[in-house]
Structure formats: structure tokens, C-alpha cells
């Protein structure tokens, strides 16, 4: 009887809508929204009280007016599209290059020993230092910005692919080999699908970094994206409200991309379970 009670209790507790687990799960979905609204409310109070000068912290109403004006005339939307295009192309190129590279590092100790140190060293070079070199080598416009994004995203994609392949259950791989799976079939049907959650986590992190790389590239190499909008807001007469409006667009893009790729990752995990 005691054993039955112990077995039933957890299931009842999990199913109860008022249980701590259930309440915590519901709160987890709304926590980011509550936190964001709290920050905006605090910002509004500080601006209304005049604690900080407007050139340091503009009023949320001024930022909203600038943001809405930029969206209404299409300027900020067009800039966001340009930045997303460069970031997306860079992330795509990094994925195409990083997947086979990460797989090779995972499966070949020689490749890992040869390329590993250089991949780590590439992360020591800041994007601001690379951008002027790309201008000299390639020029201005979309292509050098895409190359910069590719370089930035490459490392997390390679590392996540390497870890995903190395952590596979070797018994599953050996069983597939015993069933007659060749190398290509093994990669396509077993290894990459099982490593997909780890790979998607790396791409999710990389895409967020890619947006940052696109903005830095646009500030240095020109263009019509959000980086150019930030540069214009930094002019001799700094438009702080415009800077905050562009930053708000960047935050929205980063959060949206993160949530979308997180959802894709969850769907992939459910499909594999």
C-alpha cells in the first residue's frame, strides 16, 4: 500500500495544475516578458523623474516615437532586412563550411590536432580588427560583411558539430555498420540526425553572433543596414533616441531568432525521442 502511494503521488503531483512543477513551467514562459516590462517601467520612472539627462537616457516615449517613425516610413524595416540578409548569408555559409569541418575534427585526430589551435586562435581576433582588412581585400558592400559574419559564426558551428558527433552512442553507430550501412549512409541517416540538437544549438548561438557581426561590418564597411543607422545616430549631434530605437530593433531580432531556433531544436529533439 505504501509503495502504491509512493508510485501514485508523483504522477498526481505532476498532473495537478496547481503543483509547483506546473506553476514553474507556466511562469517560465512569462518570465522574460515580465522582466522586460519591469525594465521598461523602471526606465520610464527614471526618465520622468529627470534623474539622468536626456542625452544620456532618453525618455521611452521619445524612443518609441523614433522607432515608430522609422518603421512607418520603412527606413528601419529596410535596414533590418539588409542586416538580416548579411547575417543569414553568413550563417548559411558558416554552416555549409562548418558542418564537414566539425565532422572531420570529430572523426580524425590528425585534422583535430592540425586545425584545432587555429580555430581557437581565430576567436582572439575581434570583428572590428577584421573589418578594415576585409575592406582592403574585398571592398565595400554585402560580400565583405557576409564574409565577416561567416568567420564569426564558424567557430560555434564547428565546435557544436564536433561535440555532437563525438558524444554519439557508439553502440548505435556500430549496429548500423553491422546492418551494412556505408560511410555516406551512416553520416546521412545516423550520425547527423542524432547530432542535430547539438548542431542546432551551435547554429542558434552563431546566428545571434552573426547579427552582431553584420552590424559591426556595416558600421565599418558601409551599407544600408542597422549598423549604418547606428553610425548616423552617432553623428556630431548624437541622436540618442535613434540609437536606442536601433538597439531595440536589434534586441527584437536577436530574441526572435533565438526563440525560433530554440523551437526548431525542441521539435528536432522530440522527433528523435
Predicted regions and their residues:
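Glycine-rich helix-loop "coupling/hinge" segments at transmembrane-helix boundaries
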Residues: 135-137, 212-250, 269-273
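C-terminal transmembrane helix and the adjacent membrane-cytosol boundary/short C-terminal tail
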Residues: 109, 166, 197, 201, ...
Amino acid at each position: 500500500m505504501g509503495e502504491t502511494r509512493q508510485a501514485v503521488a508523483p504522477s498526481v503531483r505532476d498532473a495537478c495544475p496547481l503543483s509547483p512543477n506546473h506553476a514553474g513551467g507556466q511562469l517560465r514562459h512569462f518570465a522574460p516578458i515580465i522582466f522586460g516590462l519591469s525594465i521598461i517601467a523602471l526606465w520610464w520612472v527614471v526618465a520622468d523623474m529627470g534623474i539622468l539627462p536626456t542625452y544620456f537616457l532618453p525618455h521611452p516615449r521619445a524612443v518609441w516615437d523614433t522607432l515608430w517613425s522609422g518603421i512607418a516610413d520603412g527606413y528601419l524595416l529596410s535596414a533590418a532586412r539588409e542586416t538580416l540578409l548579411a547575417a543569414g548569408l553568413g550563417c548559411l555559409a558558416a554552416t555549409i563550411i562548418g558542418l564537414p569541418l566539425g565532422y572531420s575534427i570529430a572523426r580524425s585526430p590528425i585534422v583535430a590536432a592540425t586545425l584545432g589551435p587555429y580555430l581557437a586562435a581565430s576567436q582572439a581576433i575581434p570583428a572590428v580588427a577584421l573589418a578594415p582588412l576585409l575592406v582592403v581585400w574585398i571592398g565595400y558592400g554585402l560580400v565583405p560583411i557576409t564574409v565577416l559574419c561567416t568567420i564569426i559564426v564558424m567557430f560555434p558551428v564547428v565546435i557544436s558539430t564536433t561535440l555532437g558527433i563525438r558524444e554519439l552512442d557508439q553502440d548505435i553507430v556500430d549496429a548500423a555498420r553491422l546492418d551494412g550501412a556505408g560511410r555516406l549512409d551512416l553520416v546521412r541517416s545516423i550520425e547527423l540526425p542524432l547530432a542535430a540538437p547539438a548542431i542546432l544549438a551551435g547554429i542558434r548561438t552563431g546566428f545571434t553572433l552573426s547579427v552582431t557581426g553584420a552590424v559591426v561590418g556595416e558600421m565599418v564597411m558601409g551599407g544600408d543596414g542597422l549598423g549604418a543607422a547606428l553610425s548616423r545616430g552617432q553623428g556630431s549631434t548624437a541622436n540618442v533616441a535613434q540609437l536606442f530605437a536601433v538597439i531595440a530593433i536589434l534586441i527584437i531580432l536577436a530574441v526572435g531568432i533565438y526563440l525560433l531556433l530554440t523551437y526548431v531544436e525542441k521539435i528536432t529533439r522530440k522527433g528523435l525521442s
